Amino acid sequence: MKGVGKPYENSHTSFLLVFFVLTLFSPAFSINTLSSIESLKISNSRTLVSPGNVLELGFFRTPSSSRWYLGMWYKKLSERTYVWVANRDNPLSCSIGTLKISNMNLVLLDHSNKSLWSTNHTRGNERSPVVAELLANGNFVLRDSNKNDRSGFLWQSFDYPTDTLLPEMKLGYDLRTGLNRFLTSWRSSDDPSSGDFSYKLQTRRLPEFYLFKDDFLVHRSGPWNGVGFSGMPEDQKLSYMVYNFTQNSEEVAYTFLMTNNSIYSRLTISSSGYFERLTWTPSSGMWNVFWSSPEDFQCDVYKICGAYSYCDVNTSPVCNCIQRFDPSNVQEWGLRAWSGGCRRRTRLSCSGDGFTRMKKMKLPETTMAIVDRSIGLKECEKRCLSDCNCTAFANADIRNGGTGCVIWTGQLEDIRTYFANGQDLYVRLAPADLV
């Protein structure tokens, strides 16, 4: 028939036209990015994978639960290990969920299009498109699509950790924004909702980390002494890891870096209340616990021995009065009720006082201490002697022979001794007790 082409010719032409249009106008697909016209859905099982194929972001559910979460895990390990969960306390109730970009924010929608989680940021240029990207270090960021560096970040998952600290993540305060980055345990090994334990930085005087069970302080790390935290001597330098603690006008934060990126290591607060360093062992296909804190529930329990006493796992009982101090209540002390602590045999005279040196110690709690990083140990001793309220002193930094000064003017609490590491603490004594 004139003017009518063969059916297969029209079909072939239409197919080529559709293919050309889709190729020309469809967004460029990248395995680690999500554009404003793309989405992640439980139904399509799409995930984002970091460059290097180390970490993967997508939807998951735990074996015993029907609830769904948006989270991140190690991609290539035989043991599924989650390192971040977006909606840990607001899970999807069924297998219908969508992550997309809306109004310059990442939004997680449930089966009724109700928002269960959002980045909820308010800054940015509305005329500039945004993109979500999973970076090589595991940081999931929402950024200006025209800026690939940190200046373009509108939001980042590194600012909102769950129970895990990855290399390059920071634990502590951003003083410019007031943001406090801390870890909170899972409710159980099979439930990612917020659990009982949290690990937070306190920044008064000499910063250190506190482990809380709900609102109760159960352990403290001891202050950073330039090498590590004085109450965590197990966390020593490894050839493939660099530790850093920053304290300046912009931030007070701890981080660690890997010098060998083929090794996977992380810090985690477990559902049972342990802060742990874990490193993956390929030969065994398991996470190896390098150290765990609290190390023991004798000497690592907060203030177990009371004021002016110290804990030593190698003595019986474990609580001991500082040299030239005696139990405040001898009867209770004999019953191993140590919370009353110890008291001086001789009151300080403020003239002719001296010091006893305690080696390999976890420094006392520092929230009321006085810190001066500009002077050394000798000047620190003089300053302590010139203050009748001074009860002890120590170096703030133990590197290069010791620098800086920490002075205590109140009771000395939560002290313990170690077989190795720790640092020197100088406790003030009256002249009669120096013999």
Curated annotation (Swiss-Prot):
Pfam families: B_lectin (PF01453), PAN_2 (PF08276), S_locus_glycop (PF00954). Stigma. Keywords: Disulfide bond, Glycoprotein, Self-incompatibility, Signal. Residues 33-155 form the Bulb-type lectin domain. Transmembrane segments: none annotated. InterPro entries: Bulb-type_lectin_dom, Bulb-type_lectin_dom_sf, Pan_app, S_locus_glycoprot_dom, SLSG/EP1. It comes from the Eukaryota. Glycans are attached at residues 113, 120, 244, 260, 389. Disulfide bonds join 380-405, 388-390. Residues 1-30 form the signal peptide. Residues 350-430 form the PAN domain. GO terms for biological process: rejection of self pollen. Involved in sporophytic self-incompatibility system (the inability of flowering plants to achieve self-fertilization). This is S-locus-specific glycoprotein BS29-2. The lineage of its organism: Eukaryota, Viridiplantae, Streptophyta, Embryophyta, Tracheophyta. The gene is SLSG.
